[in-house]
């Protein structure tokens, strides 16, 4: 509601699945699934996969156990391994943080790397400077 989120550009009502179904998703979309529970995450993911498009990025927050459980359930429901391999989950680059702002930074860095078709490697490893040959 507007009182709780006064600065929100848009407030959407409905189930997670209905909301995702009504959103326009295409090959240029970047999607992050962050809900209040395992079942909602799965329903969002199913709604995205059911659209039969390949967004540039689908990421889902979750522990290794939650992700494995969700993937197993989706495989049992008929979704393919190929579909699930396109999902970035757990999301973000490995920066070993539990701070929300730093986790968000790791997620955005991963999305940027995907957008730019890069790996997220350290620049010092990509553009090596040979210190031994400076003299």
Locate each region found by the language model:
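Short, catalytically relevant binding-site loops at active-site mouths
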Residues: 1, 18-19, 38-40
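NAD(P)-binding Rossmann-fold cofactor-contacting core
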Residues: 1-7
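Short, conserved active-site loop motifs that form the nucleotide-linked donor/cofactor pocket
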Residues: 9, 29, 87
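Conserved SAM-binding strand-loop segment of SAM-dependent methyltransferases
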Residues: 9-15
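Short amphipathic alpha-helix with an adjacent loop that forms part of the alpha/beta core around
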Residues: 17-27
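Adenosine-phosphate binding glycine-rich loop
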Residues: 61-135
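ADP-ribose/adenylate-binding Rossmann-like module
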Residues: 30, 35-38, 46-73
